[in-house]
Amino acid sequence: MEGLQRCFVLHYRPYSETSLILDVFSEDYGRLTILSKGARRKRSNLKGTLQPFTPLFMKWTGRGSMKTLTHAEPISISLPMRGYILYSAFYLNEVLVRVLENDTPYPVLFMDYLNALRELAQADNPEPALRRFELALLHHLGYGIDFLHCAGSGLPIDDLMTYHYREQKGFIASMMTGHFTFTGNQLLAIAARRFETPDQLKAAKRFTRIALKPYLGGKPLKSRELFIPRTRNIGK
């Protein structure tokens, strides 16, 4: 590659005694696996730099599946994440690692991710930012569901009616109830990415769970386990 690339480290793991293997999301090259040689040495100038949620300029070499880092510098300080918000940000990273193929550019998704992190850093409630990012991710993965029109008739969604979701096809008017049933009001809120009530947020979360399941597979997300203690404490 030529020049510096805007990146975020999504995840890292030790490699040998002195190095790190990085899962990186880059603006123009998508997700990459990059070896950072010597990053774990005590005197490494990269110590503390290759962290999630820190905007970075990076440069690397290599044409295979594993690149080699040649330069990294912070663009700015890490976006501030604490507690429940931090767990939410780790969730975004884990989803990207799970669903994105290596070396596939997603420049618009990169900006969606950056905007989601900025929104999380200022949020009291992370749920709206998470739902908006999940919906953006589904769009970039080619999951083109129309929330504004009935899949059966093509008629506009009526906010007073009920609709049943057929996976990969869309929503049809229905009197059914259950996990795959949504009100027109909920669908219009999802379409607008505007969640003004808890009911609309819960519906958006239910939909994104359904839609992302084929991409995430059956293995549980580790970041979701971090939410369990907080949920239990709320109930006490």
Swiss-Prot record:
Q: Which GO terms describe its cellular component?
A: bacterial nucleoid
Write down the Pfam families for this protein, in alphabetical order.
Answer: RecO_C, RecO_N
Domain of life, source organism: Bacteria
Q: Name one GO biological process term.
A: double-strand break repair
Keywords assigned: DNA damage, DNA recombination, DNA repair
What the record says about family reads: Belongs to the RecO family.
What does this chain do?
Involved in DNA repair and RecF pathway recombination.
Query: What protein am I looking at?
Result: DNA repair protein RecO
